[in-house]
């Protein structure tokens, strides 16, 4: 379909990607497929609302977010509900369905100089899901089983809903400064 390179690179105990990767410079892309105009935000990019809005402004009818995310057992918080709500918010604010795919399983972190010689593991919490255009979850996978989830959406009805809300009509990009 095309090339898009991950823009935001995480750097923490689990995801030390800045050591290995350079941020992408392609911007956020959308592609026309046989079924819909789609946008894809890889991993950490999905947490940034600018990613979703950038693709929606380009006409994305469905947003796809493939990722590998987990938080247990070292962190005292389960980040899965927060992750899910962020993706639901991207859907609701842009009136587009979201397909969020996450892996399951465990990765061991071997001691190294880069991680302070810590030994740990990371459990990926699965929970892949599909929303409708308003952010409502229509189907969701479990946390620990490999599963396929799917959903259906009436893209013409979604487009009508986007127009009726006026979110794109009433935007004021000339005053959005960083």
Language model features with spans:
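Short hydrophobic alpha-helix segments
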Residues: 2-4, 141
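Short, P/G- and charge-enriched loop/turn segments at secondary-structure junctions
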Residues: 15-18, 27, 114-118
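Active-site beta-strand termini and strand-to-loop segments that position acidic
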Residues: 31-34, 133, 153
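CN hydrolase (nitrilase-like) catalytic-core segments centered on the catalytic cysteine
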Residues: 43-147
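Conserved hydrophobic/aromatic beta-strand scaffold that supports enzyme active sites
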Residues: 3, 28-30, 100, 130, ...
